[in-house]
């Protein structure tokens, strides 16, 4: 049965290029069979034959943006946001490893649907996620993602050093590999390709070289993603140096174990040397920039301008529970403010709001090799979009608020970055399917 078309009306806003935002006041997009079929002024789109039978959402006091992309977060950690500790490694030991240890099938079955509902309420339509080390709860996370309608790349954490699991050390590697293989065979490419697998050796502190090499080989064998963490914290970097003295730096550990490449997503990457950045650029590896987490755990500030100038692909990420919330608008705001703060002590280029927004939409999609499918509101792309209530964002004191017909894209974007959040999300669509809707998201056209 062919699904009913959906049309979204509002200020159409996206960022197809890094320094370029594009806006259309009182515009509309039409979504048919999961893809955007038309974009333009509301008066033109509303006269199209398919628009007559469409479900219309939004109105002149709304904004329509592409689905947001979060390329690094941890499902079982979400209940443990905002737990203060002096730095990364003590925080992991005190809060996170115990939380993940207890995240078994029953807990995941109850919690994961809430997690994916929260992503949708925040306007996120694609997320790259870690589960815990347990195979059973990873299955439940995938099942919840499938039911939610959201796009997800998920991996079961692998760790054979300082593991919180119950296996004897000499049994961890073969068991973890076999569990990961089963998860790949069940879920990689499931739900019509909406779900993908990411082999997930946690980081070099908690993985032997043997495990990392085996993980890289498994990912190559099955064509999956790889996700891990890199250069987040100074104590972490020093620990890696002590564990792997045969390598000149942290990034070389991953290079030597075969983990780098265009399907590898590396969280944080704050304290990289020039030679390490060159390795990431030359391998096509992707950085997940986690500004809220980087500040919360006192890890540092990633040099945005340096990473961008070096041509390393990157996207933004919430990194819950290191980051305290799933809202990518709050992550964008922190990304901007952290670079402003950095500029007080060192000369640097502060990214524009358009650039920040781009790296959460089209730029992130391009980094993940999905730029032709996602990231903007162009016809032909998949129908991932978010409908926002501008009355909840722009304080006008009028009811209804005046239309934003005289506002440019460069005027509106800072308002969204600094004031949008889950409370302003009226509806979220993934592949043309409503994955979240406020009761007020009715036809205002």
Role assignments for model-derived ranges:
Residues 136, 140-269:
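Metal-coordinating catalytic core of metallo-dependent amide/deamination hydrolases
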Residues 17, 382-440:
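C-terminal cap of metal-dependent C-N hydrolases
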Residues 1-50, 62-63:
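N-terminal metal-binding scaffold of metallo-dependent hydrolase/deaminase domains
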Residues 79-110, 156, 161-174, 233-263, ...:
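Active-site gating loops and adjacent loop-to-helix segments of metal-dependent hydrolytic enzymes
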Residues 29, 34, 61, 72, ...:
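Divalent metal-coordination and catalytic microenvironments
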Residues 256-263, 305-397, 401:
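His/Asp/Glu-enriched, well-ordered alpha-helical/loop segment
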Residues 82-150, 176-192:
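Alpha-helical scaffold segments that flank or form the walls of functional sites
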């Amino acid at each position: 049965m062919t699904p009913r078309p959906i049309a979204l009306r509002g200020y159409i806003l996206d960022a197809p290029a890094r320094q370029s935002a594009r806006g259309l006041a009182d515009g509309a997009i039409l979504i048919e069979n999961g893809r955007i079929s038309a974009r333009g002024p509301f008066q033109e789109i509303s006269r199209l034959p398919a628009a007559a039978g469409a479900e219309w959402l939004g109105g002149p006091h709304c904004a329509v943006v592409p689905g947001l992309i979060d390329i690094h977060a941890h499902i079982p950690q979400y209940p443990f946001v905002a737990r203060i500790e002096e730095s990364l490694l003590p925080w992991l030991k005190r809060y996170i490893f115990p939380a993940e240890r207890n995240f078994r099938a029953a807990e995941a079955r109850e919690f994961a649907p809430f997690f994916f509902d929260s992503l949708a309420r925040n306007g996120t339509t694609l997320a790259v996620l870690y589960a815990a080390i347990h195979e059973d709860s990873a299955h439940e996370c995938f099942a919840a993602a499938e039911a939610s309608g959201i796009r997800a790349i998920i991996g079961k954490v692998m760790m054979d050093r300082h593991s919180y699991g119950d296996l004897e050390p000499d049994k961890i590697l073969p068991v973890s590999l076999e569990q990961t293989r089963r998860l790949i065979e069940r879920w990689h490419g499931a739900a019509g390709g909406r779900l993908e697998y990411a082999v997930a050796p946690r980081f070099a502190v908690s993985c032997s070289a043997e495990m990392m090499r085996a993980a890289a080989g498994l990912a190559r064998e099955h064509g999956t993603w790889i996700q891990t963490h890199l250069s987040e914290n100074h104590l972490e970097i020093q620990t890696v140096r002590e564990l792997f003295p045969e390598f000149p730096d942290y990034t070389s550990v991953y290079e030597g174990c075969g983990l780098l490449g265009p399907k590898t997503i590396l969280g944080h990457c704050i304290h990289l040397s020039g030679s390490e950045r060159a390795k990431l650029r030359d391998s096509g590896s992707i950085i997940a920039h986690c500004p809220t987490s980087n500040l919360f755990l006192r890890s540092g500030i990633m040099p945005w301008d340096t990473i961008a100038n070096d041509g390393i692909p990157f996207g933004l990420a919430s990194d819950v529970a290191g980051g305290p919330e799933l809202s990518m608008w709050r992550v964008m705001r922190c990304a901007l403010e952290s670079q402003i703060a950095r500029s007080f002590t060192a000369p640097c280029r502060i990214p524009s709001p358009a650039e920040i927004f781009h790296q959460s939409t089209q730029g992130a999609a391009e980094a993940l090799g999905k730029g032709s499918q996602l990231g903007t509101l162009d016809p032909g792309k998949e129908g991932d979009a978010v409908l926002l209530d501008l009355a909840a964002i722009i304080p006008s004191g009028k009811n209804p608020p005046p239309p934003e017909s005289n506002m440019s894209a460069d005027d509106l974007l800072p308002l969204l970055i600094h004031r949008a959040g889950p409370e302003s999300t009226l509806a979220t669509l993934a592949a043309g399917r409503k994955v979240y809707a406020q009761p007020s998201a009715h036809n205002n056209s």
